[in-house]
Structures are given as C-alpha cells and as structure tokens.
Amino acid sequence: MTANRKELAVERAAKKEAVEQLNGVFKTTSVAVVAQYSGLTVAQMQKLRQQMKQAGASVKVSKNRLAKIALEGTDVVAIGPMLKGPTVIATSNDPVAAPKVAIEFAKANEKFVIVGGSMGKTVLNVDGVKALASLPSLDELRGKIVGLIVAPATKLAQLANAPAGKLARVIQAHASKGEAA
C-alpha cells in the first residue's frame, strides 16, 4: 500500500467515525437549528459554543455532505436541504434551549443567519425557530408547576393560622384596654 492509499484509508475512517458520531447526536436530539455562519470570527464561534453549552445545547460544524449522510435514519432528516454553504447545526434535548440561544446570538451577530430547523419530524422555518425560542424552557415550566402546586398549600396554612392570630390580637387589645383603665 502506498502512502497516498494509507492516507485515504485513514481519512475515510475518520469521515466514517464523524458520520457515526453525528448520527448519534441527531438520533438523540429533540430539536435542531440550522444557521449559516459565514464571516464569524473564531472568538464569536467560541462564544456561541459556550452559550449553547451553558443552555444544555451543542453546536456542530461539519461538511454538509457528511452531515446529510449522518441525518439518514433520524427524525431530523428534513434539515438536509437546509445544509448549503458554511452551516452550523445547534442541537438540544430541551426543545427551547438551542433555538433560544441561536435567536439571541443571531440578534447580536448579523453574520449568523438562521435558516430553519427541525423539532422531531416537524420542519421549522425561521419563524418556527423564533416561536420555539419565545417559549419558556423546561426548567422554567417546572418552576411554574411547582409554584402552582405549592401556592394552595401556603394559602391553606395562612388561612388556618389566621383565626388564631386574630384571636390573639383581640385578646391583646382587650388586655391593653384593661391596663389603660
């Protein structure tokens, strides 16, 4: 085997591994957002990755041809036609995390243009991604639900304690009148 053939074999193996890794990400994600990033600096891309990571999402940049192969057999296969030019794919298990960060990043960076996305088998245009981004996150929803559950118990405890408190104030007022007389 010549040196060129060895290099090609190694390159082919690396591409196959990249496709398998991407396929695993696409199979387990609930939402994918596709954006074009032509002209972004390395620092801006690092900031995007950091913001996505903080939100529980991730960003993948790969060759479009490899990404299209990796999409096969996944729920988000519909984003394949959106992969044109320098594209980035943001994914998350929380259906709101990746869209929310992508929309905020696009507002601050005009060279980051959202093309569309997919939530499961549902294809999203730019407006669909914006709509998802405007929804509360799973953690926010959980907090609201806990608040709704806890609020009645708190009010019930306040109501149960209120008559005893009123009685104590009446007795105190009566005792104060007796001392003044």
Curated annotation (Swiss-Prot):
Pfam families: Ribosomal_L10. GO terms for cellular component: cytosolic large ribosomal subunit. InterPro entries: Ribosomal_uL10 (IPR001790), Ribosomal_uL10-like_sf (IPR043141), Ribosomal_uL10_bac (IPR022973), Ribosomal_uL10_bac_type (IPR047865). Gene3D superfamilies: 3.30.70.1730, 6.10.250.290. Keywords: Ribonucleoprotein, Ribosomal protein, RNA-binding, rRNA-binding. The keyword Oxidoreductase does not apply. CDD domains: Ribosomal_L10. The keyword Hydrolase does not apply. GO terms for molecular function: large ribosomal subunit rRNA binding; structural constituent of ribosome. SUPFAM superfamilies: Ribosomal protein L10-like. One of its GO terms (biological process) is translation. Forms part of the ribosomal stalk, playing a central role in the interaction of the ribosome with GTP-bound translation factors. Belongs to the universal ribosomal protein uL10 family. Part of the ribosomal stalk of the 50S ribosomal subunit. The N-terminus interacts with L11 and the large rRNA to form the base of the stalk. The C-terminus forms an elongated spine to which L12 dimers bind in a sequential fashion forming a multimeric L10(L12)X complex. This is Large ribosomal subunit protein uL10.
